[in-house]
Amino acid sequence: MTHDNKLQVEAIKRGTVIDHIPAQIGFKLLTLFKLTETDQRITIGLNLPSGEMGRKDLIKIENTFLTDEQVNQLSLYAPDATVNRIDDYEVVGKSRPNLPERIDTVLVCPNSNCISHAEPVSSSFAVKKREKDIALKCKYCEKEFSHYVVLAN
């Protein structure tokens, strides 16, 4: 193997690889999706060189597979991500996130008066695609926000 072809992040035998995450978003995904709440090994590549993106992040989670719902929820943060299923060091499935109709438990409502902050309820947002933006409407306070506002929260 030449120096140019060397893997920058170690291969995994079985699990999930989330590739083409925009740079600086990898840690946010780990936190929001609670991906670190596992005993499985997680490998993270940050600011890796990418021909398409310039720089990208990468997450590899051994012996763990994301559900379709989890893959689709990635679309707000990493709409061009590729989620690869790995078995015996081979890619056995590839998927890309699609914008879901609803996102539950992952995001926090930016409305400080929203009941979701004081009550033991999981957040829930309806997702609406706009011309140049994505709107998220909180199930509890019914306020609508640009996804940029919710993501920055």
UniProtKB/Swiss-Prot annotation:
Its cofactor is Zn(2+). Keywords: Metal-binding, Pyrimidine biosynthesis, Zinc. GO terms for cellular component: aspartate carbamoyltransferase complex. Binds 1 zinc ion per subunit. GO terms for molecular function: metal ion binding. GO terms for biological process: 'de novo' pyrimidine nucleobase biosynthetic process; pyrimidine nucleotide biosynthetic process. The keyword Transcription does not apply. Zn(2+) binds at C109, C114, C138, C141. It comes from the Bacteria. Pfam families: PyrI, PyrI_C. PANTHER family: ASPARTATE CARBAMOYLTRANSFERASE REGULATORY CHAIN. Belongs to the PyrI family. Contains catalytic and regulatory chains. NCBIfam families: ATCase_reg (TIGR00240). Involved in allosteric regulation of aspartate carbamoyltransferase. This is Aspartate carbamoyltransferase regulatory chain.
